[in-house]
Amino acid sequence: MAAKRPPASTLKWCQQEMGPICEGIGMVVRSQIGYDGRRIEKQIRRKALQTVVMGGQDVDPLKEPNKTNAPLLSPTLPSTNEALQRARVVAAGIETFAKLMSQGTYPGSAGFTVSETGERKYMKQTSPVQSNIVANLMATADKLSKGVISLAPFPLPTITKLGTWVIANPTAQLPIPPQLKSAIPAIGQIETLIQSILGVQGPVSSVSRAPRKLKLEGVTDQVVLEPETIHATVDVEPIDKTLTKEEAEFLIKAARSVDDDNAETAIFGTQKAKPKVYRPELPKNFEVNLEMGNVHTLTRSNESSVPATRIGRLATFGQLAFGLLGGATAEVTRRTFGIGKRLQEEGIPKNPFLSEANADRIVATLCRVRGAALKLGQMLSIQDSSTVPPALLQIFERVRQSADFMPIKQVHRQMKDAFGDDWREKFEHFDDKPFACASIGQVHKAVLKDGRNVAVKVQYPGVAEGIDSDIDNLVSVLSVGGIFPKGMFLDAFVGVARRELKQECDYEREARAMKKFRELIADWQDVYVPEVIDELSSSRVLTTELVYGKPVDACVEEPQVVRDYIAGKFIELCLKEIFLWRFMQTDPNWSNFFLGKHPKTGEPRLVLLDFGASRAYGKKFVDIYMNIIKSAYDGDKKKIIEYSREIGFLTGYETSVMEDAHVESVMIMGETLASNHPYNFANQDVTMRIQKLIPVMLEHRLTSPPEEIYSLHRKLSGCYLLAAKLKATVSCGGLFHEIHENYVFGEDGIDINID
């Protein structure tokens, strides 16, 4: 190997090495494009890598795209500090790519794409590269970060691919492993991209590259690059034509991470390319399989009288408290003397109050009293395991799928109070045993005089009168022993449950909400809302047409395209509710949404049920919230803070720690909406990452969030968790872009009011 020969001057060295450096540094972006980049360390990916994709964006070339009109190889070198900053950024990227290579991940070799039919096409994997190449790359990164190796005197805002280039000697030959040979782009294209961002017009200076002769140990079939001279012409149009969609998208994010607000215009011109929306369709002749998940039969419920008086309900909670205390004492005794299952066994909760026996007690009590207590349990059941302890989550999941039903005597009394002694004469047939039980009522099948099949929801007695006391009693009992974790926002859950239950107990209000939703989705072929039967509905009984189906969370075994369809429609519905209609059904309990059959045509539909928790949102609130989401979509942290203060998330007096945590949480939630290609929820970790920020926000928050946020974010969380449960792929970014493109700010006078 030839000895190192230092260059005659920094400028001369930079001119000589421009081509290899462009090639070399280039592949960082490709190595991170798509889904494979997400498997690398999150900190490097979100911090160093988002900056390295700009290849020295610390110089901010995009902020003043016409600032430089000199030839590509300017005789003026950047300042030492500027060059050092760029060197550190590039070094971070090289280090990241070295780690990719060590795992056998190369540009385009991992991840998958989604076809319009929902088919996932996986790329081939390769074996890890030789360790000495990785070591050389790491050493190069170290030298660059310390300024030992200089960079070219111009910014590298576009870097499309990175090979295994190693600068060990200024005259060394570049070795290329066979598996990377096809990944090296033409140097002319790289120069064109650089010139486009710099705003330089006219032909690029000729660049000659001399052969390099370095041979690394362990690398065979190396390719020798022959000397070549490239001439390129730079167009004045945006550089989007020479970038892939993913590269341009990633480039914009990186520019904004260093507060460059002009990147989007520089890349796309005045018109940004519209993201292509993946709209999966159900397979031809698809039939809804009702054998699994059909809720039109009760398999886990028992008949039991509902405690109708406050004293009776209080006594039930008192029995639960004593039972939990005794169960916890017995569990501690068993653990102390090593009786039964060992604590170390998988699935055994550490908290003795969450023993198996106590779990049975909680489920039995909530299923018996129903009402507010059961509602709170159902709300908690849809939370993520990073927020609610798994053992408690299992308890509430059992609660969500189970509820005792009223004896026939109580059912008849409720129907008599609503429609008089001759209530049965209004039906051709009424099934005394319910086919579904919910938190505040149970549902019976019936047939009208005209032959229509209907569902009759009958409210449990005493529920409306005992809302506040039921919730207080349940929270008091379960708070013993520290069952609820800190930072779970229990107060928020309780507040929402109180308000929603008082609204849900008014079936006349729910009927109005149901009719309004039928109007809103009238032209939407994929969604259906059952018709309300007014003459057989009251404040405590609600009758609607009967629709057969199964809850969406019971569709986990459906084909991928069906799961994508369900999750996609659910998220699209949520976006329309808040931004288009400003009227939302805020209870994301998955049992309220069916994959069902149209009652007349039998065609598959996403069926919406239970509108008791429906509410409207003011235009001013939605306008500001839209600005926050769009700022997250754009990666604009300054705007997120500005609009968060305006809406009431922040006061303006928070510490930088609180502001950073808040912005980070918004950016995390906005990741799905910021992606211009389908988002794979199978690998999402949004809730886990936000959970890590909660302690900081709890400690430093100066004001509670706006009242509207609690119900809105609960619905959004339900959408995300459903998509994750179904392991679906959804074009969240494309759907949001469509909504935002047609959104009109300012009062429009069309607020919906059902109260």
From Swiss-Prot:
Q: What is its main location?
A: mitochondrion
Named in its record, the pathway it takes part in is: Cofactor biosynthesis; ubiquinone biosynthesis
Q: Report the CDD domains cross-referenced here.
A: ABC1_ADCK3
Q: What Enzyme Commission number(s) appear in the record?
A: 2.7.-.-
Check the UniProt entry and state the signal peptide residues, or none. Answer: none
Record's SUPFAM superfamilies? Protein kinase-like (PK-like)
Residues annotated as the enzyme's active site: 587 (proton acceptor)
Gene Ontology CC: one annotated term: mitochondrion
Q: What residues does ATP bind to?
A: 435-443, 457
Name the segments for region: Disordered: 57-78
Query: GO terms for molecular function, please?
Result: ATP binding; transferase activity
Task: Enumerate composition-biased segments (Polar residues).
Answer: 67-78
Q: Which GO terms describe its biological process?
A: ubiquinone biosynthetic process
What does the UniProt entry say about where the protein is found? Mitochondrion
Give the highest taxon in the source lineage.
Answer: Eukaryota
This protein's UniProt keywords: ATP-binding, Kinase, Mitochondrion, Nucleotide-binding, Transferase, Transit peptide, Ubiquinone biosynthesis
Q: Which Pfam families match?
A: ABC1
Q: Which family does it belong to?
A: Belongs to the protein kinase superfamily. ADCK protein kinase family.
What is the recorded function of this protein according to its Swiss-Prot or TrEMBL entry?
Answer: Atypical kinase involved in the biosynthesis of coenzyme Q, also named ubiquinone, an essential lipid-soluble electron transporter for aerobic cellular respiration. Its substrate specificity is still unclear: may act as a protein kinase that mediates phosphorylation of coq-3. According to other reports, acts as a small molecule kinase, possibly a lipid kinase that phosphorylates a prenyl lipid in the ubiquinone biosynthesis pathway, as suggested by its ability to bind coenzyme Q lipid intermediates.
The protein depicted here goes by the name Atypical kinase coq-8, mitochondrial
Per the record, the gene is coq-8
